[in-house]
Amino acid sequence: MSKGPAPFLNIGKRAKDLLYKDYNFDQKFSLTTTSNSGLGLTATGVKIDELFIGDIQTQHKSGKTTVDVKIDSESRVSTTVTVDEALTGLKTSFSFRVPDQKSGKLDLQYLHDHFALNSTIGLTSTPLIELAATIGTNELSAGAEVGFDSTSASVTKYNSGICYNKHDFSAAVLLADKGETLKASYIHTFNETNGATVAAEVTHKLKTKENYFTIGSSHAIDSSTLLKTRFSNGGKVGVLCQHEWRPKSTVSISAEYDPKVVSSPSRFGVAIALKP
């Protein structure tokens, strides 16, 4: 584990991943292949109701440089070039999408033993600029992020947070949505043998005084099967079962019931990921 603090985006990430990651309520299929030369190919297809969308992504690694190219079902081409450790602790990436001429942006990340810096700059004459910073250690860190639109000379976002991490638990508090939302999250692993873990996230809207919460759990049924559950205010219940039927190849089945949706309260989804 790094000695320094994680980037601001990672504050509260452990709890959020348990509560929301891998839940899927559509039909999704992906196939990933790799070669000894460092070239990887991933094909993904998703069926949403009667709509089918997909993309093909290639990735090539050479030394410290990684090039990703993705073509989606609407013939859009996205390219990202990442250079890792050009200088010690520095990661640089340049991305753009064709035919969108205003999509180009430059991302910089610098990790130090006592702080982490991230910046995103749009490559246009009037760019969007985002800056984020955290200070502290890998256990206790605090940070903030701000976004600025140079076209309208306005602040698009500002958030702040603090996080405390140990190997078996993590707690985080975030002030988000320009100071209008307060979020607190907690995750705790009780049994490292089967990975039995619980997590909770509480959201409070400062203006409207509304409160929301989600609690969830995760544990391994056996060495190749993971079961996740979650429950939200209002009675929404979700279940995810993920089975690794061969190394790095999984099938995930998700189900959710929301009593507030009268017409169709139940949702189901299947995701199959193959990696020969």
From Swiss-Prot:
GO terms for cellular component: mitochondrial outer membrane; pore complex. Keywords: Ion transport, Membrane, Mitochondrion, Mitochondrion outer membrane, Porin, Transmembrane, Transmembrane beta strand, Transport. GO terms for molecular function: porin activity; voltage-gated monoatomic anion channel activity. Coiled coil: none annotated. GO terms for biological process: response to bacterium. InterPro entries: Porin_dom_sf, Porin_Euk, Porin_Euk/Tom40. It is found in: Mitochondrion outer membrane. Its main location: mitochondrion. Pfam families: Porin_3 (PF01459). Belongs to the eukaryotic mitochondrial porin (TC 1.B.8.1) family. Forms a channel through the mitochondrial outer membrane that allows diffusion of small hydrophilic molecules. The channel adopts an open conformation at low or zero membrane potential and a closed conformation at potentials above 30-40 mV. The open state has a weak anion selectivity whereas the closed state is cation-selective. Consists mainly of membrane-spanning sided beta-sheets. This is Mitochondrial outer membrane protein porin 6.
